[in-house]
């Protein structure tokens, strides 16, 4: 017992006196792990973000290989690297074996799968929930992955900290390729193992206490970051639930003649669907739909949940390919889509709107100059420098509408745009929809929107399409839909018995 107490006392003295030998080992450990973590994070964050959005034939096999690599024992990794770096190995000419570089390589190889897998999961979760918004703006996969990774930068920071903790706690690989040479390649974990086996408990205990302190500090930082994020998200959620202030309902504002130098006369076919079918596995979401949508129409898609409204909008926006049939679009058609839950990046409103314009083909300077006017149209000009995630739900929807409107589209697709809004915010968005659809400069503007609100459909639509089980059961002018005879299923829906 006295021996243990003496060892602990000596270990504490080594730490408090900043023993040179102890300090050298600690600093070398931090340098190796920090360098390895930096290399692994540069590669892993990029690879993981790309894997989160990319779709290719062998993706499943790649993910299986990635997940398998997470469970590789560190000594096996060290053995493989030893064989590669040995004099007779293919990388022996580098002369890295039993060096600082070999240990950095070993830890980087161990940490890389962790960073890649965690980053992929974080980005893929956001892509699955909100990726359609960026796709509708025209963001290609690589840019989408970078935008989503940047938007999840808090999660990425926690991944980096986790990776460093994994690296500095590793022992097997660095011992095999580093050799644990005193004064050259000895790090905390290997020194603890060696000094314990030699019976030098004070130094082993001192290094163990320092290592535990480093790991504890990393976990404290992670805990504080999580608590801060929970509080921040709760505050933003509370803000989002606050009803919008009673800002004036915007009047229809004249919009400049199309920036792309042409007009679409009323009646011009924009979309032509021929026997279009969409399947999600065994489920038929759209079943042989044939219809045409022309310029100047205000088309409402109605039907019960799961009837195919959102899928039809995604098909029109080219976010979904038909399994059978065809979808033809007018040449050069400019379109934009608004979702029930818009996705705005954790950046200013102005940045979000400018991003939409930039993706539409404007230079960043042009997009930046155009955003104040776009935000003013939706009565958000005074909030242009606010973080988009700090706004209320209604303000976020109006911001997304500004992002779509600024692109000067010929047709605006909206997926239940007012479903989650308070009454005043609903009226504001409806007024903006009417402003968009108002004819101007001989140019017919087109709306296609889905809604469960039949009062809204009466106010806004010139044509109503009723869907059930992926089929069009009624396609009529709005007056005839609400006042004329209907198929029994549509009649029950209008009466409120098939919601």
Question: PLM features: residue spans?
Answer:
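A short, surface-exposed alpha-helical micro-motif characterized by mixed small hydrophobic
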Residues: 457-459
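Conserved ABC ATPase signature
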Residues: 387-391, 395
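Helix-to-loop junction immediately C-terminal to a conserved catalytic motif
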Residues: 317
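Conserved ABC ATPase "signature" region
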Residues: 140, 365-383
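C-terminal transmembrane helix and the adjacent membrane-cytosol boundary/short C-terminal tail
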Residues: 114-130, 135, 147, 205-257
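The feature captures the beta-strand-to-loop junction immediately N-terminal to the Walker
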Residues: 302-304
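Catalytic Walker B motif of ABC-type/P-loop ATPase nucleotide-binding domains
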Residues: 412-415
